[in-house]
Amino acid sequence: MIDSNFAGNAAYTFPHFLGPIKEQRNLALEYFKRAVDVSLELGTDIIGSPAGGMSNKVSYDSKLREEAYKELLEYLFVLAEYASKSGIKEIQIEATPLETEFPHSPGASLKLMEDLSGSSIPYKLLIDWGHALFSPLLKEEADIDIWFEKCKKHIGGIHLQQTDGLYDRHWDFTNPNGIITPEKILEATKKSGLDDIYQYLEVVTAYEEKDEIVFKNMKKTMEFLHKNLGV
């Protein structure tokens, strides 16, 4: 069963709806319309992706940042209308660990959802454990409990990874330097009422790693998670 169709690493090659020129932003709309079409062909009615990335010049200029945000909303409303007419039921936006993207914090995530509340179909958040715990950016808000509590009614999915909170690691669960424990996963999701939300394992291995090592560590990771999460 395919539950949803989510953009992968290739999506990060492009700035999408926050690109510096109009042509890029328009192409992003076509890209996501095609994602809608492909998702329906695959038999799923949920799509998701990060929204895009700004330049530093735009991100750190309050006026330009606000203009970019308003245009992002316009594109997302248009995309939702197309997706709704096509048969998609939900679009998920991933919160990322970069201030040059929307959204990047619990507050920004909540604001985005509120600003999109009138869209043709619901927008939801995709929260990534590693992004939510990225302390260099989030400081005291690098706390999964804060994210879950503030955003819980808007969360449609969760990305699960192992990390140290210093970078967006996307380690598997064999890494001894990780700070995410099964106990915390269970406790945080239960406390916030999110224990029925799908958590998708998202591991990004080094491109140089040998296939047999990747396979071995992924097998150990899945065994570890199944055993300790009771699934």
Language-model features: where?
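Detector for Asparagine
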Residues: 5, 9, 26, 56, ...
